[in-house]
């Protein structure tokens, strides 16, 4: 991840790669520790990472995946996968909205952009609706977020709060909004203490 945060200078100019960490790495930091071998990132205002910069830092392309890079050191391997692209200036797309409202967290000693927990939940609901095969896993991640942030259960992570965020921030309407809220209702809530 350091290559993304601190790329080498080229021709006297710093090559800045803006990105947001999502997926398992975000879950491990913000929700609950688990094991992940990959780092899912959303590139901001660019479609790809400079292949020469990645190679210079010791990364190789993952065979069969044009958007994934592998790094191996001291017997450990990690893959950096570009999960999506987003814009910092255009509101279109869920990852652009999540980035716009994101925050900064310390991940492996580096300050990186991450989605707010409410946006993580929304992104997981969108993923669950889009892919039935991964639905149970995505909804389990939503449940983990609810358990990790019980103080938000009556506000931003309530059914009304998530519905409002889907509608107002992500511009989800009609039947799609009803479907996503129905998925959210399926997620078990933590017991109130």
Residue spans of the language-model regions?
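Compositionally biased terminal segments of proteins
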Residues: 1-193
């Amino acid at each position: 991840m350091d290559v993304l945060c601190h790329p080498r200078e080229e021709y006297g100019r710093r090559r800045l790669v803006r990105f947001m960490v999502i997926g398992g790495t975000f879950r491990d930091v913000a929700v609950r520790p688990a094991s992940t071998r990959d780092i899912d990132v959303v590139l901001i205002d660019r479609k790809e990472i400079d292949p020469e910069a990645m190679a210079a830092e010791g990364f190789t392309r993952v065979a069969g995946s044009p958007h994934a890079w592998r790094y191996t050191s001291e017997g450990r391997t990690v893959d950096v996968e570009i999960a999506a692209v987003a814009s910092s200036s255009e509101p279109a797309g869920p990852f652009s909205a999540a980035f716009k409202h994101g925050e900064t967290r310390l991940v492996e000693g580096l300050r990186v952009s991450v989605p707010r927990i409410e946006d993580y939940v929304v992104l997981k609901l969108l993923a669950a609706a889009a892919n039935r095969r991964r639905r149970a896993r995505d909804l389990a991640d939503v449940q983990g977020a609810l358990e990790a942030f019980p103080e938000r259960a009556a506000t931003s992570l309530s059914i009304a709060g998530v519905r409002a965020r889907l509608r107002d921030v992500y511009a989800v309407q009609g039947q799609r909004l009803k479907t996503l809220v129905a998925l959210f209702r399926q997620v078990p809530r933590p017991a109130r203490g």
